[in-house]
Amino acid sequence: MDKLLERFLHYVSLDTQSKSGVRQVPSTEGQWKLLRLLKQQLEEMGLVNITLSEKGTLMATLPANVEGDIPAIGFISHVDTSPDFSGKNVNPQIVENYRGGDIALGIGDEVLSPVMFPVLHQLLGQTLITTDGKTLLGADDKAGVAEIMTALAVLKGNPIPHGEIKVAFTPDEEVGKGAKHFDVEEFGAQWAYTVDGGGVGELEFENFNAASVNIKIVGNNVHPGTAKGVMVNALSLAARIHAEVPADEAPETTEGYEGFYHLASMKGTVDRAEMHYIIRDFDRKQFEARKRKMMEIAKKVGKGLHPDCYIELVIEDSYYNMREKVVEHPHILDIAQQAMRDCHITPEMKPIRGGTDGAQLSFMGLPCPNLFTGGYNYHGKHEFVTLEGMEKAVQVIVRIAELTAKRGQ
């Protein structure tokens, strides 16, 4: 465990922010830097079958140290950080023995407050790693990367019985492309766990069904003084579209298993406007209904427009709820829960109000629930992780490997 914090701080010092709307994978050069560093560290650690694909998927194998028909299992994390907030020049703060109250983030007015983030009340006495208020931290998912690397070092340096352990580090998870170029057959695991969750004890096997909705609106611009009966204001049409979307079904008004419509961006002029929504729902039927609703709204608002003016709507599914694939293999969850209990952690089964690479991988034939990392408040300046939570994640990874070996012997 002595190098866990050192690894994490090294990884977050590299800017690996991914970029949406880019064809190449990985979408940024910074991700390659971390992937090459990890490849070198895996080689130095003595892992075998190390490959780094042209699409930035890094895979490696820790050979089994016991005989028997033991299934090969995998652990996966992503190297990119969210494009939602800057990941450049990350300057972590280490708060040892947190005693409660506000934590100043850097030298400005930014604070990490238990008033806004009550979970801090549960973390008294722990070591917190925060931002300086200018960037995100990158615990999502460099905490997971550091935890997997540290677990490998523990397994390599101690006589803990384990079968073949596969590890993978993927790019562009935050922009939904991480798993698209993942070769499940080459990876060679019967099942895997992404290490990409939140607080200690989280074990997730349900996630949103997800789709993106891109709307292009073409209007007609003329001088406002002579516009009657001629102007078609694309911005006004955009406003009408959003007014038809249920206001009480937005991210800021939903929780738990509730789905939502989210207007992520909107830009334009009188002549042309663009809107980008994301749709999320755990229930497949409700998910399909939400997509139909968006089409109906576009038809309603676009009815009767001049032939040269139009509303174009494109819906693209991003990923689906992995529950249906994971529950076919209950032992995957049983082992993870037992590993947590053995590490004195109460498993907390909760739905992911988002997605992970594991969701896509589960539909590609690799059942892949999600383990906690010990991090909180991802994608922004209030992101932080606890050192104790990271250490617990390492213990759980190691224990999963050990329990899987016992199961196969």
Swiss-Prot record:
It is an enzyme of class 3 (hydrolase). GO terms for molecular function: metallopeptidase activity; tripeptide aminopeptidase activity; zinc ion binding. It is found in: Cytoplasm. The active site is at residues 80, 173. It catalyses: Release of the N-terminal residue from a tripeptide. Binds 2 Zn(2+) ions per subunit. Its main location: cytoplasm. Zn(2+) 2 binds at residues 140, 174, 379. Zn(2+) 1 binds at residues 78, 140, 196. GO terms for cellular component: cytosol. InterPro entries: ArgE/DapE_CS (IPR001261), Bact_exopeptidase_dim_dom (IPR036264), Peptidase_M20 (IPR002933), Peptidase_M20_dimer (IPR011650), Peptidase_M20B (IPR010161). Its cofactor is Zn(2+). Keywords: Aminopeptidase, Cytoplasm, Hydrolase, Metal-binding, Metalloprotease, Protease, Zinc. Its EC number is 3.4.11.4. The keyword Cell cycle does not apply. One of its GO terms (biological process) is peptide catabolic process. PROSITE patterns: ARGE_DAPE_CPG2_1 (PS00758), ARGE_DAPE_CPG2_2 (PS00759). Belongs to the peptidase M20B family. NCBIfam families: peptidase-T, PRK05469.1, PRK13381.1. Cleaves the N-terminal amino acid of tripeptides. This is Peptidase T. The gene is pepT.
